[in-house]
């Protein structure tokens, strides 16, 4: 289903998760990996992030995963391809572990998103039968992440690049901005513009970001989409 070798391994894990159980707990595949896989593998993403915005369902998942079964609690029964290679660690922010597929480690996390509520995904919002965040919630969560860390060089401005590569219709992007602003106010648009300006003004920075994320699409195309993103949020 996916072209990149690491994404194929992520796809294997997705296909072995208990999709119905995760949906029942309002736990959705999100973050940069879900976006990269859904929008054409324009970059490589290495970790798996699931997101829950319901405290009751998060509590139930925390109890499930911190029990004796560990990750097996949310996997299909009798599977042999995925193994847990790190103890489950759970706190008020998330549930974290690492999985192995063919001796390749993959970080796995379920994050409690307490700032915005997620809408229920539709049938089109799936990867390997696993429900993902909707495009609206993917964008809103990326807008929040961008405000948190756009100036962190180690992040390589991936949040604004992900938003640009999604190519959301203007109306949907503005709806995502409004949703993110419920948590962070007008800093959402301000920080988005700052991130774009940083990419434009720091010589060679976009090249460095693209290299770090193994992006092979033309740089001119990335610039085109970043500039379109800025126009949408400043009109």
Task: Please describe what each predicted stretch is.
Residues 1-235:
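Compositionally biased terminal segments of proteins
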């Amino acid at each position: 289903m996916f072209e990149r070798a690491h994404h194929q391994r992520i796809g294997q894990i997705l296909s072995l998760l208990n999709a119905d159980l995760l949906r029942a707990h309002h736990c959705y595949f999100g973050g940069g990996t879900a976006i990269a896989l859904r929008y054409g593998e324009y970059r490589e993403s290495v970790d798996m992030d699931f997101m829950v915005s319901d405290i009751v369902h998060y509590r139930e998942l925390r109890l499930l995963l911190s029990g004796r079964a560990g990750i097996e609690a949310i996997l299909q029964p009798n599977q042999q391809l995925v193994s847990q290679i790190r103890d489950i660690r759970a706190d008020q922010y998330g549930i974290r572990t690492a999985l192995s597929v063919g001796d390749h480690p993959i970080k796995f996390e379920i994050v409690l998103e307490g700032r915005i509520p997620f809408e229920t995904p539709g049938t089109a919002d799936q990867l390997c039968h696993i429900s993902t965040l909707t495009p609206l919630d993917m964008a809103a969560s990326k807008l929040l992440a961008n405000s948190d860390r756009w100036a962190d060089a180690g992040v390589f401005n991936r949040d604004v690049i992900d938003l640009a590569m999604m190519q959301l219709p203007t109306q949907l992007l503005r709806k995502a901005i409004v949703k993110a602003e419920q948590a962070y106010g007008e800093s959402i648009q301000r920080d988005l513009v700052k991130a774009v300006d940083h990419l434009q003004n720091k010589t060679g920075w976009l090249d460095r970001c693209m290299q770090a994320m193994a992006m092979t699409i033309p740089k001119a195309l990335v610039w085109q989409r970043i500039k379109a993103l800025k126009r949408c949020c400043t009109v």
